[in-house]
Every structure is written in structure tokens, then in C-alpha cells.
């Protein structure tokens, strides 16, 4: 069920004095923002509410929560939201069907989309990956962790039909794996921490291991971007500020993350919260500009999405997906970089 709340946050006097003034910040403009609950990639949106950054940017943030990516991007077709953060697969789907544009990368989830095994099995499988032939692999098909499975199998010199692939939702995988079902479980965060802490599971192969990058996308409706480029720049600058702030205020960020996850009904250990930060590389403004630079050809981000799009086309999730250059744009990043106030805000200066 779609849950909605309006959050503009409270501004402490010290924050107001420290932050650079936002253009036309005296009058708030409504901005409809979509995210998913208890997901690290969405955390900067929650953090901005707690820190009062939306108001500093002149934004009245109306935040909608969606349970998953597909209904989230489908709602964009009805103009239910203007900007948001979603997974890489929904972002490609949204680009293909609803003209969503990717304007940034919230984080890299390659280390948290993982094939996991029981600790006692790890050494044997690594020594002889062919021992997985005929074994049951529990996976949520046509998702990013399935994309990771495909790439990990390639490194093992195995084909998909060499295994018994069992399609289950993430909660079902945890339940089945805990009772001894399956040799391999494909999981993503925060489920990987449950498997590690309660079942003694360990990573066998991640997206990072197999060269399958799994970003999380900062997106906007194409029409809204065309009509409101300044508002989109303020939004992205605020998200980038959250990324920069989290890097330099780790302990305070951990406390805020706990409140965000609790709001979504997710409880994990303190060690898991720390792992969320450690295993999710994030990118500030300058890193974004380098990752999305096309001056010498396709950007690094373009190359990430070429592999994912090919997989989504192969499994039928997105037929003939558009080229990354069609829906990934650095125009908003460049707008921020060229505006001294927005640049300073994005850099948490």
C-alpha cells in the first residue's frame, strides 16, 4: 500500500547560519518525491528532512513511499511524483516506458547483491565451482541479484541450465535457506545481514566480484525536468549534500539511519547498519561529474547500464531498452557545478 507523508524538517539556528542561502528560499515550492522504505539508497531523502535541508533549498517535500520499484515507476506515468530514487532495473524500465531520466547515482549496490552459501560449503565450492552442477539456487528472478547470478556463473564457467534455479521472493529465500533448502541463496541488503548473522551464511560471489555493477538511480520525469530544471537541481544538490554529510558524520548518520529503517518496519543490528555504509560506495558531486563524463566516449555509468540493459532485454523485462545515453544525463550535475550556491550546498560546505 502506498504510504505518504509530508516532511520539510526543522531548522536549527546554527544550520541556518552555516548553510549557504538558497535562491528564492523564502517561498517554498511543492516537490513530489518518491522513494522506498528502509533502503540505504533512499536515506539522503529522509536525512534531508531531519536536517531541514529541503526548506533551505526552498522545497516543500511531499514524499511518497512505494513497496518496490515497478509500482514506483508506474506511478510516474500518472504524474504521481516528480523526482525520486529507485533501483537500476526499475530505472531502465521507467526510461523505456515512462520517459524517466537518470540524473545521478545514489549508491553502488554491487557489494550487497550477493550469492551466499553456508560457511561449511564455501571452501569446497570455491575450489571446485563445478560442484554446483545440478544444485538448487534460490533466487528472485529477473532482478539485480539474478543479473549478478548470471555474471557469477560466467566466472564459474557454468551455464544457468547447469543449475536448478528456484524463483522465490526474498523473504521466502531466507525462510527456505534457514531450513536447509538450496545450496546457494541470492540475496540483497538488508537480507544479506540476516543470512550472515542468523544462518551463518557467507558471500560466495557478489556483483562487485563478477564485474556486474548494480547502481541505484536518482531519477526525474522528463517533462518535469524540462519545465523545472532549477527545482530538479535543488533536489539533486540536496541529495548530494546528504551523501557528503554521511561520509563526514558517520555516527550521527547511523543514528538517523536507524530511525529511517524503523519507520519502514526494518530492524537490523548495529553491525549491519555499519555494513550498510561500508558496503555501499557513494559518489559526491565531483565523482559524479567524472563518472558521467562522455567527453571521450561512453561514460563509466553508460557502461554500467549497458550490461544491465542487455540482461533485462534477455529475460524479457524490458524489450529493446534505450541506449544509456538516451536516459542518463549529466545536465543537472553541470547546472549545480556552475552555480556557486548549489555547488557549495551539494558539497556540504
Task: Kindly give the residue locations of the regions a language model identified.
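Soluble non-cytosolic domains of exported or imported proteins
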Residues: 66-70, 85, 139, 143-144, ...
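Bacterial N-terminal signal peptides
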Residues: 7-18
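Secondary-structure end/capping motifs
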Residues: 228-319
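Pocket-lining segment of extracytoplasmic ligand-binding domains
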Residues: 121, 172-269
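Sec/Tat signal peptide C-region and signal peptidase I cleavage site
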Residues: 19-25
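Conserved C-terminal helix/tail region of periplasmic/extracytoplasmic solute-binding proteins
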Residues: 305-349
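Short, glycine-/small- and polar/acidic-enriched structural segments
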Residues: 26-169, 176, 183-189, 204-206, ...
Amino acid at each position: 500500500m502506498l504510504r505518504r507523508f509530508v516532511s520539510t524538517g526543522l531548522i536549527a539556528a546554527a544550520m541556518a547560519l552555516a548553510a549557504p542561502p538558497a535562491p528564492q528560499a523564502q517561498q517554498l515550492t511543492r516537490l513530489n518525491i518518491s522513494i522506498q522504505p528502509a533502503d540505504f539508497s533512499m536515506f539522503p531523502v529522509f536525512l534531508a528532512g531531519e536536517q531541514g535541508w529541503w526548506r533551505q533549498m526552498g522545497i516543500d517535500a511531499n514524499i511518497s513511499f512505494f513497496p518496490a520499484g515497478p509500482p514506483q515507476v508506474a506511478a510516474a506515468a500518472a504524474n504521481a511524483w516528480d523526482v525520486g530514487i529507485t533501483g537500476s532495473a526499475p530505472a531502465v524500465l521507467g526510461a523505456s516506458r515512462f520517459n524517466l531520466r537518470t540524473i545521478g547515482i545514489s549508491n553502488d549496490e554491487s557489494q550487497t547483491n550477493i550469492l551466499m552459501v553456508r560457511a561449511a560449503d564455501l571452501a569446497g565450492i570455491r575450489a571446485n565451482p563445478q560442484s554446483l552442477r545440478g544444485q538448487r539456487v534460490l533466487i528472485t528472478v529477473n532482478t539485480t541479484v539474478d543479473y549478478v547470478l548470471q555474471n557469477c556463473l560466467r566466472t564459474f564457467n557454468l551455464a544457468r541450465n547447469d543449475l536448478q534455479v528456484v524463483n522465490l521472493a526474498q523473504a521466502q529465500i531466507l525462510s527456505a535457506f534457514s531450513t536447509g533448502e538450496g545450496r546457494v541463496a541470492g540475496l540483497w541488503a538488508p537480507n544479506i545481514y540476516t543470512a550472515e548473522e542468523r544462518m551463518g551464511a557467507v558471500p560466495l560471489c557478489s556483483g562487485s566480484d563478477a564485474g556486474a555493477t548494480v547502481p541505484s538511480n536518482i531519477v526525474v520525469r522528463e517533462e518535469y525536468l524540462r519545465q523545472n530544471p532549477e527545482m530538479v537541481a535543488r533536489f539533486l544538490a540536496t541529495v548530494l549534500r546528504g551523501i557528503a554529510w554521511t561520509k563526514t558524520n558517520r555516527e550521527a548518520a547511523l543514528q538517523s539511519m536507524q530511525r529511517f529503517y524503523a519507520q519502514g518496519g526494518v530492524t537490523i543490528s548495529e553491525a549491519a547498519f555499519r555494513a550498510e555504509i561500508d558496503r555501499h560506495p557513494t559518489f559526491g558531486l565531483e565523482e559524479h561529474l567524472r563518472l558521467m563524463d562522455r567527453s571521450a566516449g561512453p561514460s563509466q555509468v553508460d557502461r554500467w547500464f549497458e550490461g544491465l540493459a542487455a540482461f533485462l532485454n534477455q529475460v524479457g523485462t524490458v524489450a529493446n531498452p534505450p541506449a544509456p545515453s538516451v536516459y542518463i544525463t549529466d545536465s543537472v550535475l553541470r547546472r549545480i557545478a556552475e552555480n556557486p550556491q548549489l555547488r557549495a550546498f551539494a558539497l556540504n560546505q
